[in-house]
UniProtKB/Swiss-Prot annotation:
Keywords: Acetylation, Antiviral defense, ATP-binding, Nucleotide-binding, Phosphoprotein, Repeat. Residues 129-143, 161-171 have a biased composition (Basic and acidic residues). Disulfide bonds: none annotated. GO terms for molecular function: ATP binding; ATP hydrolysis activity; cadherin binding. ATP 1 binds at residues 210-217. This is ATP-binding cassette sub-family F member 3. It comes from the Eukaryota. ATP 2 binds at residues 525-532. GO terms for biological process: defense response to virus. GO terms for cellular component: membrane. Gene3D superfamilies: P-loop containing nucleotide triphosphate hydrolases (3.40.50.300). The modification N-acetylalanine is found at residue 2. The modification Phosphoserine is found at residues 83, 155, 157, 161, 283.
Amino acid sequence: MATCAEILRSEFPEIDGQVFDYVTGVLHSGSADFESVDDLVEAVGELLQEVSGDSKDDAGIRAVCQRMYNTLRLAEPQSQGNSQVLLDAPIQLSKITENYDCGTKLPGLLKREQSSTVNAKKLEKAEARLKAKQEKRSEKDTLKTSNPLVLEEASASQAGSRKESRLESSGKNKSYDVRIENFDVSFGDRVLLAGADVNLAWGRRYGLVGRNGLGKTTLLKMLATRSLRVPAHISLLHVEQEVAGDDTPALQSVLESDSVREDLLRRERELTAQIAAGRAEGSEAAELAEIYAKLEEIEADKAPARASVILAGLGFTPKMQQQPTREFSGGWRMRLALARALFARPDLLLLDEPTNMLDVRAILWLENYLQTWPSTILVVSHDRNFLNAIATDIIHLHSQRLDGYRGDFETFIKSKQERLLNQQREYEAQQQYRQHIQVFIDRFRYNANRASQVQSKLKMLEKLPELKPVDKESEVVMKFPDGFEKFSPPILQLDEVDFYYDPKHVIFSRLSVSADLESRICVVGENGAGKSTMLKLLLGDLAPVRGIRHAHRNLKIGYFSQHHVEQLDLNVSAVELLARKFPGRPEEEYRHQLGRYGISGELAMRPLASLSGGQKSRVAFAQMTMPCPNFYILDEPTNHLDMETIEALGRALNNFRGGVILVSHDERFIRLVCRELWVCEGGGVTRVEGGFDQYRALLQEQFRREGFL
């Protein structure tokens, strides 16, 4: 630093002592942060300009800074020990401070010797200038080595590089790949991801999978809000919230999602109006011609047809496409949000359980549509068949990290098993090798003739990489209690039932269905066809307009609603919920019941609002099965459940000794459980003899006829 000090003294002989100390301090403490002369000019150039008065212009100040920068670079090896370095991973201070006594006093910090003779006013003025400069700089440089960003209760921190920052700010970064390295994501005091990396290559379709509650939805939100840094030139859309209802027709709402087209059309109308009114100044005609060329380039005239095809594929009839958005229910507005995202075609499309809002027909259409998607997709889904149809890669979230796999979900399962097997083999082989070396060390530790060999073996042990045993995910087990006596049919039936809310719109006409304790019936059909209405008729929650509902006197039905979350008190814990619903039992019984569905330990005592969607579903299952029903009616039970839980639910239903009727859109779950397939359509229910294969073939043929494929 003496050389830099000499440069300052020689170039600015009149420099104030306090300012001199201040500048040399900045140069010393920030030397590792100056990656170019521009950084140094930005840090102290303005201050040196004030010191020089009129004796040096900008070029002169820059020349001085260049000399000091060269000196700092030459001195770099000597100052390396004090330089700032990029951490291997972001550090959580809360984890470090847990090891310290909060009551510890640090006298060196509390009472510091005041030996400085610097003029307080001058120092204050200099520090104010530096603070203003640093604030200005921090606005430009958003890439710091650990930058906490908060989204509701979630936060993220990540390492960054100045090189990427400069490419981004200069506009030279033209890549549409998304690469985020070495980041953490936390939710409250829980670490969801630690030192994780995610790489999304342009044009590939990624399925994000993992157990409930590990942070998949939180990760999507971090990307959507750019709390995890996605390059600014990459457009992204996160289908999370339903479209707000107003008087805009559904089709127009979708068209408006293309902001480029809308801006061009708006400007076209303005220019046309000016020319028609005689207010044109001469340049309007040329601008209008340019706008027409751009509209033709983006095929603006074909946009309404493309939007209509998307809406039709998602189940909107021509009449519905012209309805105001305020007339749609929440589920249909979510479909509308998905349609807008598909129409807008962002560079990165983020989807969180898109199949939850769709029926089987719409899911099959979406599978076909996404297979030709031109840009990048990251989708959270627990629908195995959906991921097999659309995913080119799988990202597995587990153990606070992300592992990437090439291929669809079935390929991922095989690759993961092979990877775990290889990891276990490597771990066991190293353990044997370590043990072999340790035996030698223990045997000859006190043998002077073997001392050098023992030391060599100890160094070998130190150099071995630390391999950890394979972290296997626990198996999910669910069981429906069935300690009841069987009884003879008829168990549950609807006979010649008519039902409607409005006589002008009959939902069912002469409906006749029946089920017994051996039944495993799955109901499918388009949204609005009456699936949930039929379930409520079977439950007895709705009374037929005509016809009869018959239920056995010993029948005890357990009902799972697709809107179960809305029926839970989210301010209480799972244990409190069961205690209120079934009072008078010991807490151990409530905990045991919840444990059957994977809600154990502190999870059972946390407010339901803090649980993931899948965990709330498990609580709803625990509540539903507490009275030991002998028949279950389930409306979309797999929504929000992870794949392992869906598999466990399927096994539990197959082992259950009572009857089951369920509505589902999950193809694998239907194939796992279903013995009968009912299709709701045209005011009635049809039994499909060929099962789901026949139903899928019928839908594919319908798509071909309607031109969707």
